[in-house]
């Protein structure tokens, strides 16, 4: 085995040096890529933590809102129950007052004729009974008697008295 010629050794050394440079360059690029990947992984991990924390906070906020809405619903349902009870009570009162209202309406409709009747009765009361000297001979002792003709055994007739009590 003979020694290789010096040119071949120089070329081989140059080639080895180029391979070493390329290997060092690739290792540096690999290191840079690994650093970049680690940095991205850390950023993604932080971002995931932030998103997870935000999601947890949203869940808690949703739960608080649901609890508040449930409380509001219970309060509203209690108010509805109370109002329904008040309506039932008022309906019952209206049912009790309705016949009286109808009676009052009937009285109001009949008031003018009753007022006329009361005025006539007051006039009759003002006139009073006839004096005994003005009576017709052979007639009853009092011209205004309470006799209906059905009281055959009754010898005594009661005089009519006009009153305005209603």
Curated annotation (Swiss-Prot):
Residues 7-89 form a coiled coil. Keywords: Coiled coil, Cytoplasm. GO terms for cellular component: cytoplasm; type III intermediate filament. It is found in: Cytoplasm. Its main location: cytoplasm. It comes from the Eukaryota. Disulfide bonds: none annotated. Residues 129-166 are annotated as: Disordered. This is Vimentin-type intermediate filament-associated coiled-coil protein. It comes from Bos taurus. The gene is VMAC.
